Amino acid sequence: MNHFNSGRRAALSALLATPFLSLKVQAQGSDWPNRPVRVVVPWPPGGGADTTARMIFPKLAQKLGQPFVIENRPGASGSIGAAEVARSAPDGYTLLHDATPLAINPFLLRVSFDALVDLKAVFLPMQVPMLLVMNPAQAPKSLAEVIALAKARPGSLDWASSGNGSAQHLALELFTRAAGITVNHVPYRGGGPALTDVVAGQVGYFFSNSNVSLPFVQGGRVRAVAHTGRGRIAAFPDLPAIGDTLQGYEAYEWNCILAPARTPTAIIEKLNTALNEVVQDPEVAARYTQLAMVVRPNSVAEADSFLRSETEKWGRVIREANIKLE
């Protein structure tokens, strides 16, 4: 009898506590942030993710009235800093500003966390399409001609990437499968050396980060025939998308802002709303266009769906191509 009464009292206490828990979560969202927020960028200073973070978070600080302090925590292709955030308290005061390898690393490295379980995608601040570039001495003048040449000479076109398992390598593997071609993959140690050798004529073709290669295209040092994004892009409005020819093809380098998985929904939604406003700021939008970055308004659900689809897509490509790090 005592056990029965104890059980009833526990159940009644839990029931009575539920509204107060709900009110507590709401309160967490309403007064957040009331102190500085730490933003972990798991990449070196001056890189793409760091550049984007330093465009966005000062504006976010102005909007929300608290500092957003960027800490660079590079290592293991972003995994060290990401794991640190995944283990952090889910209170909205530690965020992660990460990049494309977040969706690639689980299939190539030993990582100590699951981004789809231990982290919550909040917002996609940018996507950067890649440009299919080549040395101007190469014969093709269009995407169709590149594909036709590759089909006529299977395995003979030298195609650079910024390294095994890089976003550029995966974009290439996705492209060759969609086009039904084979090429000779030439991995470099970074995109800079790869683009340098395309300019010098040492290697023929490359999927290059658009904000890096666009000045070379504009200066006539490389030829671009297509981009890996969707539709027309403001920074290069006359360049067609590969997806216009190969239906469904799409590949980006991107950044994603995330929080520990159990961060209150009210905080996540407040952050998403504020970030959507920040990227529409005229100064930020102009800088995005200058850097050939694409930003589209996105909800928490859309950011989450994107991260999941990227993880599934690149995992499939890595398995099919049997990609391994040397």
Residue ranges and their predicted role:
Residues 4, 10-27:
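N-terminal export signals
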Residues 26-38, 89-93, 147-157, 218-221, ...:
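Immediate post-signal peptide segment of exported/extracytoplasmic ligand-binding proteins
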Residues 27-117, 156, 181-204, 297, ...:
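N-terminal (or domain-start) structured segment
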Residues 34-36, 178, 218, 265-326:
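An extracytoplasmic/periplasmic, membrane-proximal ligand-sensing/linker region
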Residues 46, 100, 135-140, 161-166, ...:
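Short coil/turn segments
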Residues 87-92, 108-193, 242, 254-287:
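Hinge/capping helix and adjacent helix->loop/strand transition within the periplasmic-binding protein
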Residues 97-102, 126, 161, 191, ...:
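Beta->alpha turn/N-cap motifs
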Residues 127, 213-281, 309-312:
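C-terminal lobe and pocket-closing loops
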